[in-house]
């Protein structure tokens, strides 16, 4: 099961008493600000949670798994996430949920 933006909005509605519209807008604005910062080449640091960084990957050789043909994998920029120590610790100490 995954946490969705809709569930985050619902949580803000329940816990903070925001209207459903305001809660949804708050979640959208939060993620839009992260997107904007990354698009502008900025690092995003969320204290107690982790860091979003941009990494440039060089072109490298690859292979088509169906045909075995050599094909180049083009250079690209990727987003990486490094969890902070507090998040790592909480995840490591959490009891696993039964599926």
From Swiss-Prot:
UniProt keyword terms in alphabetical order = DNA recombination, DNA-binding, Transcription, Transcription regulation, Translation regulation
Q: Which molecular function GO terms apply here?
A: DNA binding; structural constituent of chromatin
Q: Tell me which GO cellular component terms the UniProt record holds.
A: cytosol
Which residues lie within the region annotated Disordered?
49-70
GO terms for biological process?
A: DNA recombination; positive regulation of metabolic process; regulation of DNA-templated transcription; regulation of translation
Which CDD domains would you find in this protein's record? IHF_A
Q: Which Gene3D superfamilies match?
A: IHF-like DNA-binding proteins
Subunit-level organization: Heterodimer of an alpha and a beta chain.
In UniProt terms, what function does this protein have? This protein is one of the two subunits of integration host factor, a specific DNA-binding protein that functions in genetic recombination as well as in transcriptional and translational control.
Q: What family does this chain come from, according to its entry?
A: Belongs to the bacterial histone-like protein family.
Q: Which HAMAP family match?
A: IHF_alpha (MF_00380)
The protein in question is named Integration host factor subunit alpha
**Which source organism does the UniProt entry give?**
Cronobacter sakazakii (strain ATCC BAA-894)
